[in-house]
Amino acid sequence: MWLVLVWLLGLTGLVGLVGLVDRAAEVPDAGVPDTGAAGAPRLLDPVTLAGRTAPCRVIFGPHETNLGQGRALSARHTAYYQRRAAGGAGLIITETASVHESDWPYERAPLAADCAGGWREIAAACRPHGALVLAGLGHTGLQGSSAYSQSVLWGPSGFTDAVSRETPMIMEEPEIAALVAGFAAAAATAAGAGLDGVELDAGPGALLRQFHSGLTSQRADRYGTDRLALTRDVLAAVRTAIGPGRILALRLSCDELAPWAGVTPEQAADQAAALAPDLDLLTVVRGGPYSASAYRPDAHTPPMFNQDLAAAIRAAVAGAVPVALQGSVVDAAAAQAALDAGAADLAEMTRAQIADGELVAKLRAGTPDRIRPCILCNQTCRVRDNRNPVITCIADPRSGHETTDPPPAADALAAGARAAGDLTSAAPAGPALAAQPITPISDQNGTYRSDQEEAEERGQAGAEGGGPGPAPDVLIVGGGPAGLEAARVAAGAGLVVRLAERSAVPGGTLRAAAAGPARERMAALADWLEAEARRLGVQIDLLAEITADDLDAAAEAGTQIILATGSRPVTRFDPALSVDALAILSGAARATVATAPAQFHAAGPDGTTAGLGGDAVGPRAPAQVHAAGAVGGPSGPAEAVTLPDGPVVVHDPVGGPIGVAVAELLAAAGRQVSLVSQDPVAGTLLSLTGDLADANVRLQRAGVTRELRSLLREVSDGTALLEDVWTGAQRRVGCAVLVDCGHRLPAETLYLARPGTPRAGDCVAPRTVAEAIREGRRLGQAAAQRRPADRTLLTR
């Protein structure tokens, strides 16, 4: 059922999303900050709100975490927020708590009445690091759920929610009075717990916004004739409740992407200007009941997509209130460029700090290259579904698990020391953080300053691989995400690590995934893992063959061994008529477009290619990829693959991003493509990342035929035999070649030769990058616990 609900959520997001992506694509590239307006603030400059000073202008915004105990905040929340405070965040807004018991939108949604203790602990944990902490407060109204409360939903009018299909009761004076009182009581509780203020939610899923919008409010009373009346009443009650000297912030949806009746940017400008005198901070967001996925979309929506909207709202409020930019702000240089351009006064970098809780500290230390990148995949940080997954990050398994996953030595430095630019100090952070001298993000040329001493002091030359040396403490076989993370963690603990990778470039599945449209950011994570491993002194040997005899020799020398050899394809159909999907994505083949039939050309003898690009057509050129063979595995360079002329069938029994990406790539190369799935919609699992509806729109626009509710039975004689999953009726479609996007098998040759050897990632069971990095991390930690007595923990 949850998949159906999330699919519906994505479907409702179709309205207006195409225009959103088109408009966002017009935002100038903000890769390098420019000089901007005279006097523009720096991202690391302090900012004063309601008399309280935050150490910088980077916000860690409110989001669902599933870290709660019942409806109360837990010790896991405290550790989660404390890590971001220690990492330098200027302003932290806690997970939005319901202000009234009528609102229970998801099972572990906090209830403000149960949050006093949790807020108090969070405030105490974050205060020593200088961060200001606000309580997120809200009510989801008709966009909530009655599943947990067993009570009717509240709404301004009888608008049926597009996702739940529930119709709310129309709020009358008693419900409105209870709502206002609930906001006031929750705010008073937050203030009493020692928080610096509150943020009220009038965003895409909020009851306050529902009163603002002609889509959801058709009232004839004063709350309809003046759509801001309820918000004004709430603001006045909350201001009285928190008293003077505390921050009152508002998260305001300024474009519902439904111009026929919803809030438009022009209307929002008037609303913001009217509310600004009552506010200390205004965060500009986008989305509504038909476009919830526009709030925090995946990488198919360009970063900084709200910059134009924030700039318009900031102009409308004319300095009456500081404005925060939200919307896939994942790069500090781009955030600084937005401040330079006058688009905002602060930047909310929530997912960027889920990926790297020390983002600000690394900026202050002058090491932006060490920031773990957010790749905007939404795979594990988008957690609102009935499985109740705990928030985490595919790149940082410790995120969300701070109470159970100890920091590796390489990441365990105190934020206070980093703020002062001293990466060797382990001195505890203290209240003086906010008073530390501000280290500029960039030099006068607008480029980041690198920390050259890092590589030199860690013996970078030794990390280049090559010559023989003493036996390493750890030998890792496989340079995909699991192997690189294991190497990084083990080396960070002071171990001498050798990593052997059979292909020409490390990165494995991340490199292959980066070939998919709008998935280029995956390569940034591969680059980061490799760079961090080399910085920590890992010897990375490429085009290296490791045999079972090599494992025996290493074990005899006392070397710990970790296998991370990846996966291999399954041969389900005639191999003469089928191609493995990763052979295409990895760059083992290249699609071209010409008057002649499109052909696929093999990789060069060194195993590298330019990937799918060059003559590829379409709105987005795929990233270059430098990998071949069974990505992340031991299969070596791929054999030459030439796809014959004619229609291509992409078989996707998994329903993940691979099948959609391959179909898009082939269609962009001019091929006639059919995507076969047993599901009622293509890319079913993309519902978890918010890309499901968008993906189906892209496939439709690209001319891909979606053969849904279909099982692939055979491929022969230039056709594929499909069978309807419900009726059993069979039909044939043209098929010159089949691209297999199905489940894979472990590449376990070495493991079977030496059973019991520790292994991580796809060679255990093929899954996703998230599991690969998590298991690699765990084996790196385990190796560190067994490190030789003469090895000491590194402090770099």
Predicted features along the sequence, with ranges:
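Flavin-dependent oxidoreductase catalytic cores
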Residues: M1-S425, A429-A432, Q444-N445, R449-E453, ...
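Asp/Glu-rich intrinsically disordered low-complexity tracts
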Residues: V21-A24, D29-D34, D411, G416, ...
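Hydrophobic anchor at the start of a short beta-strand
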Residues: V133, L248, V323, V497, ...
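A short, basic/flexible loop-to-alpha-helix module at the beginning of a structural domain
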Residues: S399-G416, G462-A471, D580-P597, G636-P644
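A Rossmann-like FAD-binding core segment of flavoenzymes
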Residues: P431, A523-V570, A589, V593-A598, ...
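Beta1-alpha1 glycine-rich phosphate/pyrophosphate-binding loop at the start
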Residues: P472, I476-Q539, V650-G690, D740, ...
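Glycine-rich dinucleotide-binding loop and its adjacent helix/turn
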Residues: T565-A669, G756-T768
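A conserved FAD-binding loop/helix module that cradles the flavin
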Residues: D652-L665, L685-S687, A760-R796
